[in-house]
């Protein structure tokens, strides 16, 4: 990564899972914390669990790095405020005269990963844009306990305050594909009414149009539905973070996603290899208050086996978000800040 300022869309990712080992971030990151303001540093130190502190620290570093490079100002001169609500509003960069800088950025973190998406209009382009990002981890929570007790349909209804009735029906009874134990992928439209199954540990059987018959455990179907649920969730979070409202948005259930596909996973990091990116999808349809949204472009990218990262860009419909760039803490962040 060079020292030049950033233009256009930027998508960054930093993995904190192996950073700052130990139990206390104050000791583990003593050589890094001085790069933050007092408020930023205190926010990191208030975290009880070091995993949360790592992500909070990485988030603060990414925001400072982006603002410094996008505005071409020294690291120490970066000032961050919030638009609207001083507590829950969307973070923004503040210029020396106290006005908001004409850039937009958003961060997300989950299970050790931290993402940043930013927009800085190129010279001569006055078009403004809003950006949002979100990260989900499919197997981070103990979702199966409730699913095993009450069924996948009842588990989905836990989120009735977040998703519309149509979205919840779609998640319960539709699936885009399942992956058999031998790696073969069966498209959802070949499953027949097997896709109505909402219980784990059931024996299922399908006959494909070719005449092939496949038998499998319903755990594979529920796994696929669960991954698709998190695709819905990731899209919704990224969209509502465009304006910084998050799940407080009063129009949450009026925001619906159609043609949702869960991107096929990458591979998890092994002893001698890094985790790999999986599929990227960008053909989701967004509906708000019953009307199709035309000015927002969304993408969903799989990373390793369980992560998915969403981007939302409003105001630049024809501009495709670039691939996420994984940053190295020492080479890309600390070296620049120093």
From Swiss-Prot:
Liamocins have high bioactivity against the pathogenic bacteria Streptococcus spp. and can be potential new specific inhibitors of oral streptococcal biofilms without affecting normal oral microflora. Liamocins are also able to inhibit human cancer cell lines such as breast cancer cell lines T47D and SK-BR3 or the cervical cancer cell line HeLa. Induction: Expression is regulated by the cAMP-PKA and HOG1 signaling pathways via the transcriptional activator MSN2. Disruption phenotype: Completely abolishes the ability to produce any liamocins. GO terms for biological process: lysine biosynthetic process via aminoadipic acid. SUPFAM superfamilies: 4'-phosphopantetheinyl transferase. It catalyses: apo-[ACP] + CoA = holo-[ACP] + adenosine 3',5'-bisphosphate + H(+). The keyword Transferase applies. It is an enzyme of class 2 (transferase). GO terms for cellular component: cytosol. Disulfide bonds: none annotated. Pfam families: AASDHPPT_N. The keyword Phosphoprotein does not apply. Its EC number is 2.7.8.7. Keywords: Transferase. One of its GO terms (molecular function) is magnesium ion binding. Acyl-carrier-protein synthase that transfers the 4'-phosphopantetheine moiety from coenzyme A to a Ser of an acyl-carrier-protein. The 4'-phosphopantetheine (4'-PPT) portion of CoA provides the essential prosthetic group for a number of carrier proteins and multi-domain enzymes, priming them for the acceptance of acyl building blocks in fatty acid synthesis and many aspects of secondary metabolism mediated by polyketide synthases (PKSs) and non-ribosomal peptide synthetases (NRPSs). Belongs to the P-Pant transferase superfamily. This is 4'-phosphopantetheinyl transferase. It comes from Aureobasidium melanogenum. The lineage of its organism: Eukaryota, Fungi, Dikarya, Ascomycota, Pezizomycotina.
